[in-house]
Amino acid sequence: MAVVVTAWLAPGEMVSFLSSLGPHVDFVPNAGNAGDALINVGCMDALERAGVEFTYWSQSQVETAPLGGRTVVMAGGGGLVPPYDTTARFLSILKERAGRLVVLPQTVVGHEALLAGLGPSVTFFGRERPTLEHLAKSAVGGAQVLGADDMAFHADIGRLLGFRVSDHGASIERLRMWAEPRLLSVVAGDRLSAFRLDAERTSVHVPHLNRDLSSLAFCGMENPGRCRLTSAYFVRYLDCFRTIETNRLHVGIASARLGKRVLLHGNSFFKVGAVYEASLAGPDVDVTYVPAPER
């Protein structure tokens, strides 16, 4: 059965789509790092704009949550790629239990058998061309396939900049983060290097004063408040700099949305470059893409 990618939804169209799901959904967020927290916040903010109430089920709660026959919205992200397996495991659970399942914009590599098993009760969003091409070949079980921007573009950045961290259990250690970026911005000349140091790192030179902010800013996602707390640390840290150089996709997205000058490097596969082409390669933001070094 051939799959037709029927549309790419603009942000307003995504909100309208979410509104069509009804007055209430069950929301399953990403696990991961501060970039994933920003995706989760974008999902929640879009649901709020759509007038849809939601129950938040952290991934530790999913296996026992009463989701049978209900409408479930799964956060987007980059977890359906090697070497990660958590997103695939939860997608396998949710496709069997949910009455209707919406998977918000993802990057996908592999997982052909899982994709082939997605039936007509599933709507699956890709966030860039390679994923949509892969879904067109692999999601042959009747799922609806759509395209849309990464959900971090739906996060209310102004709300995060005004977030009261003291209302959400912020420790003294975490509050010290506000001193470090201001000091670092002086030492590093108002320029932040935020290259990743994990499995998706490349051979790009990493400066001595590098801060892998997606890991550094993380302080939990067990409930909506902790997601917003993590995201608030994340965007406030970035807001202390004028120029950000990174190969972390959501450092790049958040920095662009803050109006910063961004040098966005590729990661270890196509993800960053493909999302840049889909959503950041325009005149409205100051983002320059730098391909990853050849291996």
Where are these regions (language model features)?
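Active-site anion-handling motifs in enzyme catalytic cores
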Residues: 1-295
